[in-house]
Amino acid sequence: MFMINVLLLIIPILLAVAFLTLVERKILGYMQLRKGPNIVGPYGLLQPIADALKLFIKEPLQPLTSSTSMFIIAPILALTLALTMWIPLPMPYPLINMNLGILFMLAMSSLAVYSILWSGWASNSKYALIGALRAVAQTISYEVTLAIILLSVLLMSGSFTLSTLIITQEYLWLIFPSWPLAMMWFISTLAETNRAPFDLTEGESELVSGFNVEYAAGPFALFFLAEYANIIMMNIFTTTLFLGAFHSPYLPELYSINFTMKTLLLTCSFLWIRASYPRFRYDQLMHLLWKNFLPLTLALCMWHVSLPIMLSSIPPQT
């Protein structure tokens, strides 16, 4: 039964990822005053299926000088970790109800760095290695602020369980009392998922395609799936943290619809940002984090710690 539940989680994720690529191309197309894909199937609806078929029936080429085992393991690890992060997400019921669900997700997103690093190193290409090193530095840096923002939210929620956040936000979304944290969280998730304007790992002008430059066919598709699964997962996480939907045990469908609509809006805003903003310079990216976000998040975290002590003389609850 558990394996059936796992499959019922994985298959919709992969379908959502497939059609997110189509939505992205359509949105970018309309924002640039063109149609986007509209030939394969009605309104281009079969385009993701055609793309998947094309990628998976091609021969997966590999550089002669590459480290074979790591070169193959890296994309598999990337997709496995991307799918594993969905386990504790309450939609409205998680696959496994974890006590430390939030810490589990943070740990898994940290491990995703290894797949990027290994892929860049195993390719034995200087472009891939530079892209991988950039990705690692960027991901590790932005995880610092993500962790501090999470801690601040947990101090308001009082638990490390994601399901508790639904109860916390029954009367008021956490985006209202903590909107500076929500803004910084959203920008940090953009950087964490290597999306524009922070897609310096794939800087076409200087790095061709970044850490996956030597990958083709199936392994490239696995990286692609992992990236888009992470985007949807991060937006679901944002919705759970700051835009909690009302949950009635008698009508869980209403929660799921509400939840999905909010996640879809956030995902579309990711694509809107990609169409609107140019890429950051690397030093500006690091400056934004270490000089702006980190002091602000630390100050707000201290505020959340001291508030219950000042007002009610009780220690912060987690």
UniProtKB/Swiss-Prot annotation:
GO terms for molecular function: NADH dehydrogenase (ubiquinone) activity. It comes from the Eukaryota. Core subunit of the mitochondrial membrane respiratory chain NADH dehydrogenase (Complex I) which catalyzes electron transfer from NADH through the respiratory chain, using ubiquinone as an electron acceptor. Essential for the catalytic activity and assembly of complex I. It holds the Pfam family NADHdh. Keywords: Electron transport, Membrane, Mitochondrion, Mitochondrion inner membrane, NAD, Respiratory chain, Translocase, Transmembrane, Transmembrane helix, Transport, Ubiquinone. It is a multi-pass membrane protein. The lineage of its organism: Eukaryota, Metazoa, Chordata, Craniata, Vertebrata. Belongs to the complex I subunit 1 family. The chain crosses the membrane at residues 2-22, 70-90, 100-120, 147-167, 171-191, 217-237, 254-276, 294-314. It is found in: Mitochondrion inner membrane. Its main location: mitochondrion. One of its GO terms (biological process) is mitochondrial respiratory chain complex I assembly. This is NADH-ubiquinone oxidoreductase chain 1. Its EC number is 7.1.1.2.
